[in-house]
Amino acid sequence: MPLSLGAEMWGPEAWLLLLLLLASFTGRCPAGELETSDVVTVVLGQDAKLPCFYRGDSGEQVGQVAWARVDAGEGAQELALLHSKYGLHVSPAYEGRVEQPPPPRNPLDGSVLLRNAVQADEGEYECRVSTFPAGSFQARLRLRVLVPPLPSLNPGPALEEGQGLTLAASCTAEGSPAPSVTWDTEVKGTTSSRSFKHSRSAAVTSEFHLVPSRSMNGQPLTCVVSHPGLLQDQRITHILHVSFLAEASVRGLEDQNLWHIGREGAMLKCLSEGQPPPSYNWTRLDGPLPSGVRVDGDTLGFPPLTTEHSGIYVCHVSNEFSSRDSQVTVDVLDPQEDSGKQVDLVSASVVVVGVIAALLFCLLVVVVVLMSRYHRRKAQQMTQKYEEELTLTRENSIRRLHSHHTDPRSQPEESVGLRAEGHPDSLKDNSSCSVMSEEPEGRSYSTLTTVREIETQTELLSPGSGRAEEEEDQDEGIKQAMNHFVQENGTLRAKPTGNGIYINGRGHLV
């Protein structure tokens, strides 16, 4: 009786609760499992979905799903409770931040949405699912909140040309996890980085150092920050400003001939560049600026030119960094004076050319005279030498003739050519003979003389004899000479001999 009464007092809800309790004590049903993620990543300020889906057999039902935060070293903190009949119940600490996903909803899906995630939400979360009739299941996941960095760029001190290694700019970014900071630029320099860690984030600072030069002025220097919480890299660009002042120069006097009296529109322009932009000032070194001259920044304009505009003009360029000066000399030309100068120049040129020509002519005359004297002296030396040789030859001939006269058998064979004309006892004056012999010492001589010279020399050899003896000696000499010739058709021809040489009638010596 009591048992039946007790059974009548239990309703279906009581029986379902009892079955859930029994399932929790007996363990999970091997037929079902929970599907979730190990790590859920969300960017700061966005909504985080905490997945928890029960996958079981058909006919199984999910009674409720309980979410709790279970950080290490701390107790479980209730987050929300989803009941199949009574709906969602959120803990007061998360009121207004925990919701169910928008419909349609699956009865087996126990996922929840955590609105507007903050860094404090990072940690581990547990999903506990109670099913019928399989029992209860649980799974854990870790929520990771990314804090995107907010980079900032700070320029360094003022850059000036001529400085050493100087800080150009520094870039700082803080986030969770630590961001990456790099530089994008065409400027040559060096970088250095340092980081600082906080409880929930880390800050990174990178510095860019360079040696300032005017070529860097106006160049971009970009800080690039990379982070997982950013859809794309963040870039901050800084334009470099390097203080400098270039050398000054003045243009307008490239053709000095254009600066003549009466010219209009003449001007001088001062060229320079710098950072900050320089200012220009014109002065005249040898006095004040002439009347009518216009100063327009870097340009100095002149009225129609006169001789009063001649002078030394100075362009003074300056900025906050430095100052420069450049000066030019203006010489306004008078066309009439220029023509006179040109005539004088031509006359001087003609005189110079004439002097040079005269010098060259004198030099030529000297060379001709010297060469003539040289050749004359050379000819005299050759003539003197020839006469000496001829004298020596004649002396040898005298000795040879004397030898022939005294001992004709000791004479070698000779060859003499004579042309017989006129008196049979005389020979032609220009006839010649050649006598070749060898001295006992082995030396040889060749002689050339006329028959008249032979007769004269023969007379000189016998000065003490009478006239009869002289004629007899002459006849004897002629006879001896005729032994070497044959008469043919009124002409004397030399007999063939190994030592004889035929000489023509011109008296050449061979």
From Swiss-Prot:
Predominantly expressed in placenta. Not detected in normal breast epithelium but expressed in breast carcinoma. CDD domains: Ig, IgC1_2_Nectin-3-4_like, IgV_1_Nectin-4_like. GO terms for biological process: heterophilic cell-cell adhesion via plasma membrane cell adhesion molecules; homophilic cell adhesion via plasma membrane adhesion molecules; negative regulation of natural killer cell mediated cytotoxicity. Residues 1-31 form the signal peptide. InterPro entries: CD80_C2-set (IPR013162), Ig-like_dom (IPR007110), Ig-like_dom_sf (IPR036179), Ig-like_fold (IPR013783), Ig_sub (IPR003599), Ig_sub2 (IPR003598), Ig_V-set (IPR013106), IgC1_2_Nectin-3-4-like (IPR033320). Residues 399-447, 457-476 are annotated as: Disordered. Residues 32-349 are extracellular. GO terms for cellular component: adherens junction; extracellular exosome; plasma membrane. It is found in: Cell membrane; Cell junction, Adherens junction. Glycans are attached at N281. One of its GO terms (molecular function) is identical protein binding. Residues 399-412 have a biased composition (Basic and acidic residues). Self-associates. Interacts via its Ig-like V-type domain with NECTIN1 Ig-like V-type domain. Interacts via its C-terminus with AFDN. (Microbial infection) Interacts (via N-terminus) with measles virus hemagglutinin protein. Seems to be involved in cell adhesion through trans-homophilic and -heterophilic interactions, the latter including specifically interactions with NECTIN1. Does not act as receptor for alpha-herpesvirus entry into cells. (Microbial infection) Acts as a receptor for measles virus. PANTHER family: NECTIN-4, NECTIN-RELATED. It is linked to Ectodermal dysplasia-syndactyly syndrome 1: A form of ectodermal dysplasia, a heterogeneous group of disorders due to abnormal development of two or more ectodermal structures. EDSS1 is characterized by the association of hair and teeth abnormalities with cutaneous syndactyly of the hands and/or feet. Hair morphologic abnormalities include twists at irregular intervals (pilli torti) and swelling along the shafts, particularly associated with areas of breakage. Dental findings consist of abnormally widely spaced teeth, with peg-shaped and conical crowns. Patients have normal sweating. This is Nectin-4. It comes from Homo sapiens.
